[in-house]
Swiss-Prot record:
Protein EC: 6.1.1.9
UniProt similarity note: Belongs to the class-I aminoacyl-tRNA synthetase family.
Top-level class of the enzyme under EC nomenclature: ligase
The protein's name: Valine--tRNA ligase, mitochondrial
The encoding gene: VARS2
Keyword Glycosyltransferase recorded: no
Domain of life: Eukaryota
Region called Disordered, residue ranges: 25-53
Keywords from the named record: Aminoacyl-tRNA synthetase, ATP-binding, Disease variant, Ligase, Mitochondrion, Nucleotide-binding, Primary mitochondrial disease, Protein biosynthesis, Transit peptide
Gene Ontology molecular function, alphabetical: aminoacyl-tRNA deacylase activity; ATP binding; valine-tRNA ligase activity
Statement: the UniProt record of this protein carries the keyword rRNA-binding: no
Role of this protein: Catalyzes the attachment of valine to tRNA(Val) in a two-step reaction: valine is first activated by ATP to form Val-AMP and then transferred to the acceptor end of tRNA(Val).
Length: 1063
């Protein structure tokens, strides 16, 4: 709505202050000095000086003299630390008798609380059973046991933040909670790290040590890293029951693993067989599917691999001619990405309907290297439109070829050894060569013999060992396998029937697909670190071709009894050799939900807390860990190990990249919590196990991502930020600046409590919450918002969507309590006599608000809650961690949705008032305000909130102008709606001669932005609505400036100067 013309304004309002019919003002505590006083003159002179300086700055920006963004970025430096320095023994309660420090300091807040929580037993279900709010219900979870290969990363912190928030909420609402801590021995990963460390520090290979000596080294590593992981979990505030801590290689776990193996074997679900497995030549062990990284290559790519002196080329298709036997000029050209496996070829296959090869069906080809005849076979698995339509068949080194070979009765030839060198079957000229060195030699010979037909780029997926970086080979090995079809079908049916709930539900599709295509699980690993397989070979002479005799037992004595039964010979006469291999780490991990509770013994914990109430973990572990827990748990205990699964997304950096050591973007939670400078980050890299080439790349990437280091953010800010990302969304893109912003939120809460404690005073006695009744509309509004926050938190926890909880808490603390109520109540608290209602409301907001916050920010909530005075009549809880969580129903009597709806109208007025002040640069003046509305109900609403309107709008007196009354002269006007206006006093508060050039400079700047946006071609992916919103916002701001300039010229009571720009 345009401003009214000059003629519509009345004379300066204060000249008619006592005239009949003029509005009455509700005065507030802030009043300006009379305009003629010396103080007023000095204030105006100072204000004019500031405005001149601001004008010069704007003009410099227009002239292009402003600093570039890079110049304005400051490096982070640790601030002066505020530390808790009162002598307190570990486990003693923190001394909170002193005043709160002036600013929030994470190190001060987080000191001393955790040891006290543990010593008091707050995290034990036995303690929780005695709480006044005890429900008699149980809630049990186990932490996904982190690998002892190193320290926790940000993905672990996300798991802890989500699980601990849920656990603390259940504990506060009165459930008996058991959250079991533990760590995983991580067989391949740990052995690889220790081997790398031994070589780096002492130049020793594993095979140069005895098995016992090497295992001592690994146990030393475990003790060091296991302790470090526990300290990290404590630093994150994880409320685990440490008396029940377990490790997947401790005695109890070993008993459970052996029992599970024996039971599965007796049930016919475990067998030994000779078949293809994923083989890491660098580790000399079979590995699980989860340890295989399927890396897509767009075409020719060179990779550095362990044991290779030079980079190896991949993403190439080599064409090789196989001569037709008996026809010197006939050949079949085969394309392959693995020419090093040519010595293992036993046939060439074509599609039976491919007319190009119909005349060769049943014919023999000649091996291009060995010269022996090879059959040309037909198989429907061949894709005739890929390459030449002819493929070589290598059953010993390809799963697809192994299936084809089995269909056609072809015997495999193993031409690659366990260490990645060529076997004797390749001939003397290749035996012992590294397979990729042999590749070059093979291609050279084929070229020399005229059988090489070309080379071309070929997109492919290359299987890489995630532990060693080596290319995976498929080798035929004698291994132990678990039959998964029957157990997998039960797991699939559990989800389909609803007995097992996966959340988010879109994971159900992957679950069903995986279990409908599941193969048998190879559980043998050629390692020293892990659970040695409880299977024994009966050593005896037998005829060529007879199978070995293997027996399984919980001990050698039991195995000997079984062997005696099988052979019919006395057990004492038999020689048994235990399988040196160990079990896949995922085997023991799959038992964790019940082995951690004492299975196979019938323990009280197993009876009370199994099945678990919830399994929460990363979505990347759905199939490899969750699926296997469901299979083995159902098979071994007769029931699902849990009925609900909550899966959180992967944590990625702000650019959307997976966090990886090789990219240098891994975030250590400790660095975010305590802060770290760049040189320290770089030193941590140098002290790790990266090789020099990797180190240089990673260090450069780290400098780019964190050029000024990482600022100190604190545990509570990190936890809150991680929980604020919804599990229903895609991957979590985390930036340090986001956590730092949450630290500022912590500071807001800190300052709010400092204000509230100061306002309450030492003699304040809180009322019981149920007796508190609001004494003003503002009190009623904030209590209603508090009740709404409790309702939203309860909904978020019940649905396990923690982003709803964080949003509700952030909105209440920041936008309702700090930004509105505390500001509005400040002048009220200094009234004389002091009203009784607001202090009680402030206390309830602090007490209940902190309890709502406690599951997500346990340290900050405890520190501040301990300083609140106790409510009379009942003993307070010793800790906020065991205080009752505010329930929505207990606060329902405070809910007033209609008041909240109407108060949003008041907030609209406040926004208009602040916008007017900003437009006219009224930085310190407190102008008077008039509100005019013909909307029914507005008059009564505004009258009820006159004082808060003046306080929140940074204005002086606020009055009501009757509908239809003439607008005052010399006042700025802004529309509130089609039926309501806001008027603000300007006469004597604004100097038009100073303000007009400032407005012109601001308009010039905005116009440049608008012109640039209009002329720019929309970028790919830029939403049309987003672009239109930017355009509309700039146009609106320009319109406001034009109206303000027009009104300032009217105040000057003279026409625009010739040649001045029209605004």
């Amino acid at each position: 709505m345009p401003h009214l013309p000059l003629a519509s304004f009345r004379p300066p309002f204060w000249g008619l202050r006592h005239s009949r019919g003029l509005p009455r003002f509700h005065s507030v505590s802030t009043q300006s000095e009379p305009h003629g006083s010396p103080i007023s003159r000095r204030n105006r002179e100072a204000k004019q000086k500031r405005l001149r300086e601001k004008q010069a700055t704007l003009e410099a920006e227009i002239a292009g003299e402003s600093k570039s963004p890079a110049e304005s970025i400051k490096a982070w430096r640790p601030k002066e630390l505020v530390l808790y320095e009162i002598p307190t023994k570990p486990g003693e309660k923190k001394d909170v008798s002193g005043p709160l420090p002036p600013a929030y300091s994470p190190r001060y807040v987080e000191a001393a609380w955790y040891p006290w929580w543990v010593r008091e037993g707050f995290f034990k279900p036995e303690y929780q059973a005695r709480l006044p709010q005890a429900t008699g219900e149980t809630f049990s979870m186990c932490i996904p046991p982190p690998n002892v290969t190193g320290s926790l990363h940000i993905g672990h912190a996300l798991t802890v933040a989500i699980q601990d928030a849920l656990v603390r909420w259940h504990r506060m609402r009165g459930d008996q909670v058991l959250w079991v801590p533990g760590s995983d021995h991580a067989g391949i990963a740990t052995q690889a790290v220790v081997e790398k460390q031994l070589w780096k520090e002492r130049g020793v290979r594993r095979h140069e040590l005895s098995r016992e000596a090497f295992l001592r080294e690994v146990w030393q590593w475990k003790e060091a890293k296991g302790g470090e992981i526990c300290e990290q979990l404590r630093a994150l505030g994880a409320s685990l029951d440490w008396d029940r801590e377990c490790f997947t290689m401790d005695v109890g776990s070993s008993v459970a693993v052996t029992e599970a193996f024996v039971r599965l074997y007796k049930a016919g679900l475990l067998y030994r067989n000779h078949q293809l497995v994923n083989w890491s030549c660098a580790l000399r062990s079979a590995i699980s599917d989860i340890e295989v990284e399927n890396r897509p290559l767009p075409g020719h790519t060179q990779l550095r691999l362990p044991g290779c002196p030079t980079p190896v080329s991949f993403g190439l298709l080599f064409s090789v001619a196989f001569p037709v036997d008996g026809e010197p000029d006939a050949e079949v050209v085969v394309g392959t990405t693995r020419p090093e496996t040519l010595p293992g070829d036993v046939a060439v296959a074509v599609h039976p309907d491919d007319s190009r090869y119909t005349h060769l069906h049943g014919r023999q080809l000649r091996h291009p290297l060995m010269g022996q005849p090879l059959p040309l076979i037909t198989d429907y698995a061949v894709q005739p439109h890929v390459g030449t339509g002819a493929v070589k068949v290598t059953p010993a080194h390809s799963p697809a070829d192994a299936e084809m070979g089995a269909r056609h009765g072809l015997s495999p030839l193993n031409v690659i050894a366990e260490d990645g060198t060529m076997t004797s079957l390749c001939g003397d000229w290749l035996q012992g060569l590294h397979r990729f060195v042999a590749r070059e030699k093979i291609m050279s010979v084929l070229s020399e013999w005229g059988l090489f037909r070309g080379l071309q780029n070929h997109p492919m997926v290359l299987p890489i060992c995630s532990r060693s970086g080596d290319v995976i080979e498929y080798l035929l090995k004698n291994q132990w396998f678990v039959r998964c079809q029957e157990m997998g079908a039960r797991a699939a049916k559990a989800v389909e029937s609803g007995a097992l709930e996966l959340s988010p539900s879109f994971h159900q599709k992957n679950w069903q697909h995986w279990f409908s295509h599941i193969g048998d699980w190879c559980v043998s690993r050629q390692l020293w670190w892990g659970h040695q397989i409880p299977a024994y070979l009966v050593v005896e002479d037998h005829a060529q071709g007879e199978e070995d005799c293997w027996v399984v037992g919980r001990s050698e004595a039991e195995a000997r009894e079984v062997a005696a039964e099988l052979t019919g010979r006395p057990g004492a006469e038999l020689t048994l050799e235990r399988d040196p291999d160990v079990l896949d780490t995922w085997f023991s991990s799959a038992l964790f939900p019940f082995s951690a509770l004492g299975w196979p013994q019938e323990t009280p914990d197993l009876a009370r807390f199994y099945p678990l109430s919830l399994l929460e973990t990363g979505s990347d572990l759905l199939l490899f860990w969750v699926g296997r827990m469901v299979m083995l748990g159902t098979q071994l205990t007769g029931q699902l190990p849990f009925s609900k699964v909550l899966l959180h997304p992967m944590v990625r950096d702000r650019q959307g990249r997976k966090m990886s050591k090789s990219l240098g973007n891994v975030l250590d939670p400790r660095d975010i919590i305590s802060g770290v400078e760049m040189q320290v980050l770089q030193e941590k890299l140098r002290s790790g196990n990266l090789d020099p080439a990797e180190l240089a790349i990673v260090a450069a990437a780290q400098k780019k991502d964190f050029p000024h280091g990482i600022p100190e953010c604190g545990t509570d800010a990190l936890r809150f930020t991680l929980c604020s990302h919804g599990v229903q969304a895609g991957d979590l893109h985390l930036s340090v600046s986001e956590v730092q912003s949450c630290r500022h939120f912590c500071n807001k809460i800190w300052n709010a409590l400092r204000f509230i404690l100061n306002a309450l005073g030492e003699k304040f006695v809180p009322q019981p919450a149920e007796e508190l009744s609001p004494s003003s509309p503002m009190d009623a509004w904030i209590l209603s918002r508090l009740a709404l926050a409790a309702q939203e938190c309860e909904r978020g926890f019940l649905t396990r969507e923690l982003s709803l909880v964080t949003h509700a808490l952030h909105h209440f603390w920041l936008h309702n309590l700090c930004d509105v109520y505390l500001e509005a109540v400040k002048p009220v608290l200094w009234h004389s006599p002091r009203p009784l209602g607001p202090p009680q409301v402030l206390f309830s907001c602090a007490d209940l608000g902190l309890r709502l916050l406690a599951p997500l920010m346990p340290f900050l909530a405890e520190e501040l809650w301990q300083r609140l005075p106790p409510r009379p009549g009942c003993p307070p809880a010793p800790s906020i961690s065991v205080a009752p969580y505010p329930s929505a129903c207990s606060l329902e009597h405070w809910r007033q949705p209609e008041l909240e709806r109407r108060f949003s109208r008041v907030q609209e007025v406040v926004q208009v008032l602040r916008a007017l002040r900003a437009t006219y640069q009224l930085t310190k003046a407190r102008p008077r305000v008039l509100l005019q509305s013909s909307e029914p109900g507005d008059q009564g609403l505004f009258e009820a909130f006159l004082e808060p309107l003046g306080t929140l709008g940074y204005c002086g007196a606020v009055g009501l102008l009757p509908p239809g009354a003439a607008a005052p002269s010399g006042w700025a006007q802004a529309p509130l709606s089609d039926t309501a206006q806001v008027y603000m006093e300007l006469q004597g508060l604004v100097d038009p001669q100073i303000q007009l050039p400032l407005l012109a400079a601001r308009r010039y700047k905005l116009q440049k932005q608008l012109d640039s946006l209009t002329a720019r071609t929309p970028s790919e992916g830029e939403a049309g609505t987003q672009r239109q919103q930017k355009l509309s916002s700039l146009q609106l701001e320009l319109s406001k400036l034009d109206k303000a300039a027009s009104h300032l010229r009217q105040l000057m009571d003279e026409p625009p100067a010739p040649g001045s720009p029209e605004l």
